[in-house]
């Protein structure tokens, strides 16, 4: 057996077992378990885990902080889609600043340092952050659906206010769904399947409650993964269908103008789809592993090296989702890329005067266009005011 896996087999049972019961990332945290033998993780493995978590935290905080700063500092970036994306960044920051460091600490020390109250608070924050991420992506997909499939229903006069209200509702719903975690999460006694030891850990239910384990894992998988992604898939199917039809049905005299509008919305929809795909890929192993544990281990936890390796991989991948969104935007959005570079290089130059707010620009355009075709100008203003690709 490779030396790395031999070292893994000798890791603290508490560090292994505390990973074994989680929901979305609400897992069991070790609380000063006494071991039957004096063993500790290999230094190479411990260093690798520590560096990985440090990179996730540092990169995630940097990227999301710059994203939020760009949104509040650059007026042209304060559009409907960007309000949701900024809300998503706040949720990611919450996870990175609280849950990721706590999770990393389990590999450095073998005692839970945050008490019973910390168990409840961390459980609540973890599930709230997951809810904010997936539900914001769902609402953002619905917004793209309305922008492309039903553009005449857009209300630009109060779009920003309504969008802020929706973002707040997403946070409230996420906190309400996470509230039971804070209520029922507590310190329970766990045992190791390969070592004759028991220990206290933070979990949303006692390990001996088979029905609770299975029900909890299924509800988390459905509410925080399957149902939202199914809704998003339905929205994007309708979006793709509409864009395909519009390619062949646009009038010849409006071909150039309509083509620009369609391309603009396609790029924004593509950006949202990439964020959704990143969430789905990053969180799927975590959910699968939790379902497997819930239906397999009821009285003890698996402390094998392979199980530990799979768990660390799933956790790191899930946490990574909180730091990749800003860099996906950097890759997909030219305007965000420009402002991101300015913030990184500490450039304090103000944006050109031509980069006015979408509402101001559309108003001027509307006043000029009224002299020509009033009806068409009103529709064009509505479609372009907050959904121009250069101002996602």
From Swiss-Prot:
Keywords: Cell membrane, Disulfide bond, G-protein coupled receptor, Glycoprotein, Lipoprotein, Membrane, Palmitate, Receptor, Transducer, Transmembrane, Transmembrane helix. This is [Phe13]-bombesin receptor. Disulfide bonds join 119-202. Residues 1-40, 103-120, 184-219, 293-312 are extracellular. The keyword Transmembrane helix applies. Residues 63-81, 143-162, 241-271, 333-392 are cytoplasmic. SMART domains: 7TM_GPCR_Srsx. The chain crosses the membrane at residues 41-62, 82-102, 121-142, 163-183, 220-240, 272-292, 313-332. One of its GO terms (molecular function) is neuropeptide receptor activity. Glycans are attached at residues 9, 26. It is a multi-pass membrane protein. PROSITE patterns: G_PROTEIN_RECEP_F1_1, G_PROTEIN_RECEP_F1_2. Its main location: membrane. GO terms for cellular component: plasma membrane. A lipid is attached at residue 346 (S-palmitoyl cysteine). The relative rank potency of bombesin-like peptides for this receptor is [Phe13]bombesin > [Leu13]bombesin > GRP > neuromedin-B. It is found in: Cell membrane. Belongs to the G-protein coupled receptor 1 family. Expressed only in brain, primarily in cortex and forebrain and at low levels in the midbrain.
